[in-house]
Amino acid sequence: MEDSTLSKIFELNTEDLIQAAIENGEGAIASNGALSLETGARTGRSPNDRFIVKEDSTSQLIDWGDINKPFDAEKFSRLWDKVDVYLAEKNRYLSKVHVGAHQDHYIPVNVIAESASHSMFSKLIFISPDEFNPQTKKEWQILSALNYECSPEEDGTNSEGCVIINFAARKVLLAGMKYAGEMKKSMFSVQNFLMPEKDVLPMHCSSNV
């Protein structure tokens, strides 16, 4: 646990995150013992609110259009800073995870979440390693501010919520998104972009042998 001038950053295990989520009023324990949460108006991914920052490393490699919508790099920086200031006034939850298990292809990610439940989700959907980033790779960062409200006129988003991937900055911004699955989809999109550049074919599947 690290003291901040305005709030605190908590790095908790799953059990403590569940307790924190309950204490914060984020959800309740269901009859089967699972933590039950509400996702708000969005019960799944929100494709119309998903963007990728268009910059030198991506401009010629991504099929831009209705699915991969471009986002201005300067607008991203301004919005990231606004969300960062918003989170600095609140208690936040840190998860240090790996996306992928292979030592050559995993991505180390620091997840900073406004809610304990989003932090817990990141620890469960990704890998919580015994040793974080042993290959000392460049780290990615996810900011998840589920209660933040974007201003489409000022921020360039399509609604009060957004999911924006910035490959050059190695950042993913989730603002106004209570559906935690956007974290998984965003980082899978990152892997699906980066791995073919290494002659590795990513597969969205699983197998028990």
Language-model regions: role of each:
Residues 207-209:
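Glycine-rich phosphate-binding P-loop
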Residues 1-205:
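A noncatalytic interaction/capping subdomain that flanks phosphate/NTP-handling catalytic cores
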